[in-house]
Swiss-Prot record:
Site (Cleavage): 350-351
Disulphide bridges, residue numbers: 35-487, 73-298, 85-97, 118-160, 302-326, 494-498
Organism for this UniProt entry: Influenza A virus (strain A/Equine/Jillin/1/1989 H3N8)
Phylogenetic classification of the source organism: Viruses, Riboviria, Orthornavirae, Negarnaviricota, Polyploviricotina
InterPro entries per the UniProt record, alphabetical: Capsid_hemagglutn (IPR008980), Hemagglutn_HA1_a/b_dom_sf (IPR013828), Hemagglutn_influenz_A (IPR000149), Hemagglutn_influenz_A/B (IPR001364)
One GO molecular-function entry: host cell surface receptor binding
Record lipid sites (S-palmitoyl cysteine): 560, 567, 570
Keywords assigned: Clathrin- and caveolin-independent endocytosis of virus by host, Clathrin-mediated endocytosis of virus by host, Disulfide bond, Fusion of virus membrane with host endosomal membrane, Fusion of virus membrane with host membrane, Glycoprotein, Hemagglutinin, Host cell membrane, Host membrane, Host-virus interaction, Lipoprotein, Membrane, Palmitate, Signal, Transmembrane, Transmembrane helix, Viral attachment to host cell, Viral envelope protein, Viral penetration into host cytoplasm, Virion, Virus endocytosis by host, Virus entry into host cell
Name this polypeptide is given: Hemagglutinin
Residues in the Extracellular compartment per record: 22-535
Cytoplasmic side: 557-571
Length: 571
């Protein structure tokens, strides 16, 4: 019990010492305290700068879009859902893809469950043909009158049924022998229009020599398709292949582009799958994408195989494949752009008198009307006000920062899928290496760009704080003293009107100079050094102990007189 009383006495003595030894300015009507500070929040956001990987700021904006909507929006881009059909099947006229004839699109969406349902085929230059058709954005077809003399046209197969009847690709004409003859074919078709024409043709590879002669008479056929600048000659490869839809033979699909003024020449003595007309080659920004995301009624400029994503951020890590005006793909999951100042959470109020501190010690929480401001303590009490001019100066330079980053990184283009056949494996490896290198480079550039912008933001906001402090110092001059923590001790009576004049820049130091000079000398003369404070502390403690002992002794004597306490002295 006595130990507790002693500790209480020591604490009270120390408090008395501080109260009388520090000479707090706001207890004196002749002085005031003015502190400058900046906005702070309890929990800031960590960002990276050039000099620091982890620096806390009051506010930051995420620059990386890391999730999609999970659905493909059909506006503003025209989306064509391929459903069960691939683009090439729709191009050739597979019976189950008739609904796509003459369709147009901005983006053709191929599904993983798409399948062919006609005679088995392959396209040696599949990726190029797919890309040309996809970028054209249409399957509009123009029939032409080719003259095929001495052969049977419109061949069909049980592998390609329309209803219950055997059929074939609607855009191709399977030519076989007529009677027991298959004459040499030599057909020309000039391009008298002012646009490029895409012709699709093919070569049939029978599974046996018997099938070859039954269809084309000759033991080996040949197909040559030429223009003035190109020529393709294909000799059928006769042989058994894995059975597909009841067929062991195959059709190889080829394509030729005929320029305006050029001529298409077709020579064959067998195995020709002839064109029925042409597709008009268009140049545009249409494309194709493999995705199983559902198509929905919504608006989005950017589409990925995962679904549409917003394009209000400069970067995304949802998918490398994109269509439309999309953020740049980077490897990082997050890149935060500082849109606020350095955050220094406000410390707990120290001391029973609630001392205030300036920006050098900490920030101020709860200052919602500005980034920079003033706090004061004077004879009229305490107050706080934001400095809107310095706040606006910082905001003007920061507000456009996000838009500038987007402008530097967004490109209005789409990244198409790259496909290569097995024989182009080395090209595919090289392409993958180039794409990976580009992504690595962009990821590094993005991180560097954001770090530079963050460094600039923090330096800028620190600079505005220092400018405001120096502006205040120049106003007060010798009428106040820099306390070293972002505060000024004003050596004259500075009421609220005086404080306001300092904030708005109309303070006249000459008016208060004499009073401030006089008060400075008086206050300095009685300021106690730390050594005197120690002596006062010990003297106060000793007196307190003495008084406590006197009170305790008096209580004991009183109790003994009343008989409440009995003392037995034993020898």
């Amino acid at each position: 019990m006595l130990s507790l009383i002693m500790r209480t006495v020591i604490a009270l003595s120390y408090i008395f010492c501080l109260a009388f030894g520090q000479g707090l300015p706001w207890n004196d009507n002749n002085t005031a305290t003015l502190c400058l500070g900046h906005h702070a929040v309890p929990n800031g956001t960590i960002v990276k700068t050039i000099t620091d990987d982890q620096i806390e700021v009051t506010n930051a904006t995420e620059l990386v879009q890391s999730s999609s909507t999970g659905k493909i929006c059909n506006n503003p881009h025209r989306i064509l859902d391929g459903g069960n059909c691939t683009l090439i099947d729709a191009l050739l006229g597979d019976p189950h893809c008739n609904v796509f004839q003459y369709e147009t699109w901005d983006l053709f969406v191929e599904r993983t469950n798409a399948f062919s349902n006609c005679y088995p085929y392959d396209v040696p230059d599949y990726a190029s043909l797919r890309s040309i058709v996809a970028s054209s954005g249409t399957l509009e077809f123009f029939a032409e009158s080719f003259t095929w003399t001495g052969v049977t046209q419109n061949g069909g197969s049980s592998a390609c049924k329309r209803g219950t009847a055997s059929s074939f690709f609607s855009r191709l004409n399977w030519l076989t022998k007529s009677g027991n003859a298959y004459p040499l074919l030599n057909v020309t078709m000039p391009n008298n229009d002012n646009f490029d024409k895409l012709y699709i043709w093919g070569v049939h590879h029978p599974s046996t020599n018997q099938e070859q002669t039954e269809l084309y008479v000759q033991a080996s056929g040949r197909v040559t398709v030429s223009t003035r600048k190109s020529q393709q000659t294909v000799i059928p490869n006769i042989g058994s292949r894995p059975w597909v839809r009841g067929q062991s033979g195959r059709v190889s699909i080829y394509w030729t582009i005929v320029k305006p003024g050029d001529v298409l020449v077709i020579n064959s003595n067998g195995n020709l799958i002839a064109p029925r007309g042409y597709f008009k080659v268009r140049t545009g920004k249409s494309s194709i994408m493999r995705s199983d995301a559902p198509i929905d009624t919504c608006i989005s400029e950017c589409i990925t195989p995962n679904g549409s994503i917003p394009n209000d951020k400069p970067f995304q890590n949802v998918n490398k494949i994109t269509y439309g005006a999309c953020p740049k793909y980077v490897k990082q999951n997050t890149l935060k752009l500082a849109t606020g100042m350095r955050n220094v959470p406000e410390k707990q109020i120290r001391g029973i008198f609630g001392a205030i501190a300036g920006f050098i010690e900490n920030g101020w929480e709860g200052m919602i009307d500005g980034w920079y401001g003033f706090r004061h303590q004077n004879s009229e009490g305490t107050g706080q006000a934001a400095d809107l001019k310095s706040t606006q100066a910082a905001l003007d330079q920061i507000n456009g920062k996000l838009n500038r980053v987007i402008e530097k990184t967004n490109e209005k283009f789409h990244q198409i899928e790259k496909e290569f056949s097995e024989v182009e494996g080395r090209i595919q490896d090289l392409e993958k290496y180039v794409e990976d290198t580009k992504i690595d480079l962009w990821s590094y550039n993005a991180e560097l760009l954001v770090a530079l912008e963050n460094q600039h933001t923090i330096d800028l906001t620190d600079s505005e704080m220092n400018k405001l402090f120096e502006k205040t110092r120049r106003q007060l001059r010798e009428n106040a003293e820099d306390m070293g923590n972002g505060c000024f001790k004003i050596y004259h009576n500075c009421d609220n009107a005086c404080i306001e004049s300092i904030r708005n820049g109309t303070y006249d130091h000459n008016i208060y100079r004499d009073e401030a000079l006089n008060n400075r000398f008086q206050i300095k003369g009685v300021e106690l050094k730390s050594g005197y404070k120690d002596w006062i502390l010990w003297i106060s403690f000793a007196i307190s102990c003495f008084l406590l002992c006197v009170v305790l002794l008096g209580f004991i004597m009183w109790a003994c007189q009343k008989g409440n306490i009995r003392c037995n002295i034993c020898f």
